[in-house]
């Protein structure tokens, strides 16, 4: 599976992911995603994505 992160906010965001079922993590610390940027990557099944939006 492929997952795409797109930042449509006016500010930089730091997505973080946590995989389940003993699968390798996509990132250990999250990653920077600047405003207007998209990135794609492989996502193992049962990937949880949690978004926290604050101003």
UniProtKB/Swiss-Prot annotation:
UniProt GO BP: defense response to fungus; killing of cells of another organism
Stated name of the protein: Thaumatin-like protein
Keywords: Antimicrobial, Disulfide bond, Fungicide, Secreted
SUPFAM superfamilies per record: Osmotin, thaumatin-like protein (SSF49870)
InterPro entries recorded: Osmotin/thaumatin-like_sf (IPR037176), Thaumatin (IPR001938)
Signal peptide: none
Top-rank taxon: Eukaryota
GO cellular component: extracellular region
UniProt record similarity statement: Belongs to the thaumatin family.
Inducing stimuli: By salicylic acid and by laminarin oligosaccharides.
Record's subcellular location: Secreted
Function summary: Has antifungal activity against C.albicans 586 (EC(50)=6.2 uM), C.parapsilosis ATCC 22019 (EC(50)=2.2 uM), C.krusei ATCC 14243 (EC(50)=2.5 uM) and C.krusei 80 (EC(50)=5.4 uM). Has no activity against C.neoformans, C.tropicalis or T.glabrata.
